[in-house]
Each structure stands twice: as C-alpha cells, then as structure tokens.
C-alpha cells in the first residue's frame, strides 16, 4: 500500500502535525531502506520514538485515515495487493499525493 505513496520529509511532516492525533499506516525509510512500519491512531508519537534511533537521512511515507478506518484501510489494501490489477493502492497513492501537495510537500 505504501510503495506508491509519496515520500515526505520527516522533519517537515512532524512539525506540521505536532500535537495532533494522526491515524494511519506509516513507514520510515533510512536512505532507501525501510526501517520501520506501523499503524494506529498516534502516528506522531510513534514516529518520534523510532526517529531517535535513526541517522540523518530519514524520509516518511504515510497513508492517513480517520479513526477506526485504519484497520479497514490496511485489510482492504492487503486484499487489493493479493489480486493483480486491484485499484485501491493506486487510488490511495493519488489521495496521499493530493493531501501532501495541499500541505506544501
């Protein structure tokens, strides 16, 4: 699901969302390596904790979703990934890119 999501600058994203309860599925990358994947209703705190253990070259991919929809988003994406030609990952990536552009990323 996250492979087509836009790569965001971690520090800028965190500054933008400081103090918010962001829900979603997210991953941190160090250089080009995925070093952390998580999901839940407190992405900001989780990402702050993991970030402390990483080097300087960190980027973030996130598919945000409201509240209880996180699990549906993950489960739906797994179903789409299992069937070639599934549209949800592409639609999610487009939605994430539009949100990122609206926020100045």
Label the predicted regions.
Residues 1-49, 58, 66-79, 98-105:
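GIY-YIG nuclease catalytic motif and its immediate N-terminal context
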Residues 55:
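A surface-exposed, charged beta-strand/loop segment in the N-terminal or early-internal portion
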Residues 63:
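Catalytic or ion-translocation cores adjacent to nucleophile or general acid/base/metal-coordination motifs
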Residues 84-94:
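Coupling/hinge elements of helicase-like and P-loop NTPase modules
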